[in-house]
Structure formats: structure tokens, C-alpha cells
């Protein structure tokens, strides 16, 4: 079932992705999308959802029931289809000892839009399928260059931009995952110290499903003049999700989150942002506004938002972080 563009207010639909004959997407209201969950069981509790959601993100059990159960069912269909294709291909190649590589799901979107909450909820729901798949979640934060490198290269004010990531390490990690290698190491990151943690890794050992979450995971790269092969992060994805919202909403969520962190995590003397915990509320808000306009808004316009049309599925959020529309790429 597809929804005609006239059935939904244009403001509720991401950019120019309105549903219709010439759109690459089917677009559904949240209510219509919720019907696709069919008999998918709700395997999370309200307390678990509260534990999984990020600071200042009010996603609750009703939102899981309304949006995430249908998404879980859709992803189950995609994983099953990939397994069928794998068996057919191994028969074709007479490779009976071949082991299927992980199904990789990319989750992209702006800072403060709710990527981490989406990724964590999906990881829990998928791990509780009847088949009990092994599900791992990795974020791109660990692939940022250490602060010492960013400071040396004058990139601290562009942290989160493509140049601030060790793309080579990131691509080597995904290549190893898709090659089916065991015990692949992913670097880890501390949001308290705002830096990569030296010599600390998350070990990923041949999961059935890997969720890979980060702001720029759908970004393309310029082709080199010498004609060398340049893989992109999204080349390793079997399915991709973009979390979207109006710019004004993301702006307010970012500032509100900063002010909440000022009262919580920033209070720790170990926090990179501890200096903001003791200044006035007006001064802190002014700093948050500056960080938004000078760094995060520019990154959104230049590097994140242009990748939205590359996603297989777009969750468009409205006020209170609740999903209003879902756009699913046509096959």
C-alpha cells in the first residue's frame, strides 16, 4: 500500500521525497506504517525502553509499538531474503563450507536527532527475534581521530565533519566484517572525555547482524583522478536508515540536550565540557547556540542532509521526537 502525496501534508514529507508515481519512495503516515507490524510481538518493556533511550529523547513503549515493530518485521524479511540468496549462491558456486557474512544496517542522521536511541532499540528488538540472532552495535565515534591529532591539524572545530574521521580505519573495519573475519576490533570513544579511549576496543566476532551508527555513514566520496577504486562506507550496508526532522526541531533538541548535560554529565571534573557547568545559564545557552550554528548546522547542510536520498528508509520525526512519516525505498 502506497500513500499518495496529496494524502499527507508536504511539510510532513522529507524534502522532495513525496510518495507518488515518480518518487523512489513509498511514503506512509505513522499510523499507516504501524499496521505493517501485523502479529510482531512486543518484546521490550517500558523500563527497557527508558534505559535504551538517550538523554532528552522521550521515545516510549507506544512509539516502539507504533514504529519499531513494523521496522523490525521489515528488517526480518530483508535478513531472511539475504539468507535465501546466500544459500542459492553457495549452491551455484558449489561452496558448501561457505559462512554467511553479517547483515549490516547503517543508521545515519544529524547530531541530536535520535540515531543512538533508534540503533539501540533496533539492536534489542532484532536480538529477540525467534531465531535469536547475534546482534552487535558499533558507532563511528571511535573512528574519530584522537583530540591530539585534531588539535594538531586544526580540526577540533570541525569534529564530526568527514575530515575528522580515520576513514581508512573505518573502511578496514567494515571490510573485515564483510569478509567474515572473527574478532574484529572497533575503537571506542568516551563522551565524558570527548575523546577516543586509547588501547580500548570493542571486539566484534561474526555477528548475524551488525548495526553501524553515525552521522556521515551514507556520505559519498569524490572519485580520484587516477581511477583507483574508492569504496564508500555505505557500500558495506545491506540496509540503511536515515533519521530526519525539521532543522528547527533538531536545533532545539541540540540546545536542550546541551543544557541538560550541563546539569548532569558536565558536572563531572573528568568531563571535557566541565567548564560549562559553572557558567551562567544564559552564557551556556549562548555557547550551545554557537556550537550549533558554527559546527553542527554547517555539517548538517554540507555533509549529512545531502546523504538522505541514499537511504533505504527515512524516519521523519516531528515534535517530541515522535515519528510522523516513514519513507521506504521502492524495489
From Swiss-Prot:
<dbReference type="Pfam" id="PF00485">
    <property type="entry name" value="PRK"/>
</dbReference>
<keyword id="KW-0418">Kinase</keyword>
<dbReference type="GO" id="GO:0015937">
    <property type="term" value="P:coenzyme A biosynthetic process"/>
</dbReference>
<comment type="pathway">
    <text>Cofactor biosynthesis; coenzyme A biosynthesis; CoA from (R)-pantothenate: step 1/5.</text>
</comment>
<comment type="similarity">
    <text>Belongs to the prokaryotic pantothenate kinase family.</text>
</comment>
<keyword id="KW-0547">Nucleotide-binding</keyword>
<dbReference type="InterPro" id="IPR004566">
    <property type="entry name" value="PanK"/>
</dbReference>
<feature type="binding site">
    <location>
        <begin position="109"/>
        <end position="116"/>
    </location>
    <ligand>
        <name>ATP</name>
    </ligand>
</feature>
<dbReference type="InterPro" id="IPR027417">
    <property type="entry name" value="P-loop_NTPase"/>
</dbReference>
<dbReference type="InterPro" id="IPR006083">
    <property type="entry name" value="PRK/URK"/>
</dbReference>
<keyword id="KW-0963">Cytoplasm</keyword>
<dbReference type="GO" id="GO:0005524">
    <property type="term" value="F:ATP binding"/>
</dbReference>
<dbReference type="GO" id="GO:0005737">
    <property type="term" value="C:cytoplasm"/>
</dbReference>
<dbReference type="GO" id="GO:0004594">
    <property type="term" value="F:pantothenate kinase activity"/>
</dbReference>
<keyword id="KW-0067">ATP-binding</keyword>
<keyword id="KW-0173">Coenzyme A biosynthesis</keyword>
<keyword id="KW-0808">Transferase</keyword>
<protein>
    <recommendedName>
        <fullName>Pantothenate kinase</fullName>
        <ecNumber>2.7.1.33</ecNumber>
    </recommendedName>
</protein>
Amino acid at each position: 500500500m502506497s500513500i499518495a502525496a496529496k494524502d499527507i501534508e508536504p511539510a510532513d514529507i522529507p524534502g522532495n521525497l513525496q510518495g507518488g508515481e515518480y518518487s523512489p519512495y513509498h511514503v506512509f503516515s505513522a499510523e499507516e506504517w504501524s499496521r505493517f507490524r501485523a502479529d510482531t510481538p512486543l518484546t521490550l518493556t517500558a523500563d527497557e525502553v527508558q534505559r535504551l533511550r538517550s538523554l532528552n529523547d522521550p521515545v516510549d513503549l507506544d512509539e516502539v509499538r507504533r514504529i519499531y515493530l513494523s521496522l523490525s518485521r521489515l528488517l526480518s524479511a530483508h535478513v531472511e531474503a539475504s539468507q535465501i540468496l546466500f544459500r542459492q549462491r553457495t549452491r551455484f558456486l558449489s561452496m558448501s563450507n561457505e559462512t554467511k557474512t553479517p547483515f549490516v544496517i547503517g543508521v545515519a542522521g544529524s547530531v541530536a536527532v535520535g540515531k543512538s536511541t533508534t540503533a539501540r532499540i533496533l539492536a534489542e528488538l532484532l536480538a529477540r527475534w525467534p531465531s535469536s540472532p547475534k546482534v552487535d552495535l558499533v558507532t563511528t565515534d571511535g573512528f574519530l581521530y584522537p583530540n591530539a591529532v585534531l588539535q594538531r591539524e586544526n580540526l577540533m572545530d570541525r569534529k564530526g565533519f568527514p575530515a575528522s574521521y580515520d576513514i581508512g580505519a573505518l573502511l578496514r573495519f567494515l571490510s573485515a566484517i564483510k569478509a567474515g573475519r572473527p574478532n574484529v576490533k572497533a575503537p571506542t570513544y568516551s563522551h565524558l572525555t570527548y575523546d577516543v579511549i586509547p588501547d580500548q576496543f570493542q571486539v566484534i566476532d561474526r555477528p548475524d547482524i551488525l548495526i553501524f551508527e553515525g552521522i556521515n555513514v551514507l556520505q559519498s566520496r569524490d572519485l580520484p583522478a587516477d581511477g583507483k577504486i574508492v569504496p564508500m562506507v555505505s557500500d558495506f550496508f545491506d540496509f540503511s536508515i536515515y533519521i530526519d526532522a525539521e532543522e528547527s526541531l533538531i536545533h532545539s533538541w541540540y540546545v536542550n540536550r546541551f543544557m541538560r548535560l550541563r546539569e548532569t554529565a558536565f558536572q563531572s571534573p573528568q568531563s571535557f565540557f566541565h567548564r560549562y557547568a559553572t557558567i551562567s545559564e544564559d552564557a551556556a545557552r549562548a555557547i550551545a547556540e554557537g556550537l550549533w550554528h558554527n559546527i553542527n548546522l554547517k555539517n548538517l547542510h554540507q555533509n549529512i542532509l545531502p546523504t538522505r536520498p541514499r537511504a533505504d528508509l527515512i524516519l521523519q520525526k516531528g515534535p517530541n521526537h515522535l515519528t510522523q512519516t516513514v519513507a521506504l525505498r521502492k524495489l
